[in-house]
Amino acid sequence: MDLDAIDLGLIDYERAWKLQDEYAAEIADGKRPPTLLLLEHPHVYTFGRKGQAENLLWDELKLKEKGVAVHWVDRGGDVTYHGPGQLVGYPLIPLTPLRSDRSQSDSFDLEDDSSKPVRSDYVGYVRKLEETLIAALMRLGVAAGRRSGLTGVWIQADVHSHCPRCKPQDREKPAKIAAIGVKVDARGITRHGFALNVNPDMDYWDGIIACGLSEPVVALADLLEPVPAMDVVKQAVVTAFENVFA
């Protein structure tokens, strides 16, 4: 795949959302190659199409105090957090048209337009995103994997048992290190993507029930010493992405 990887640095969520729309249209028209946007966001909670308001635990006063924006967006899944120290990736790539069951997962969605054909193996696409992140983490020295029936990338309990931030009871459970929530638009271009926890302020997960699951969340900073630089993590992700999607 001829991939254009673009590093946007720290960028507002709404601005990045608009860029996805602009670039996806260009890709669909053949004016831009498949693109991977890599970035960080200011503090924000985003709710997908399956989002439930009760999974937001902080009130408006607390949100203002912590400087957190809230957006309801057109990806699949429930609520997640984005913020500085977390690597967000938005792959914008065309998928091969393929009729598929819309109900296969809550964490990815197709454009809701029954007048147009359902396109693409989006479940297979999400599995490839998981494979990409697992491979990138392996390059960084962290073993990770999937969990049956769930979307995202997880660290086994015996790996993060030394995590000083994690509650003792949570060290006995798998912990989520990367979240995935995507959309495939009516022209077959992917939107949204993944969020990999590198060294974010983990206190912000206290404000939500992430992805509607009461499971522990972990970051590379909990697992590696020293913490790899963000540029190193980005390169690992780009290399893994190019290999998996070759």
Which residues does each PLM region occupy?
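N-terminal lobe of the biotin/lipoate ligase/transferase fold
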Residues: 1-174
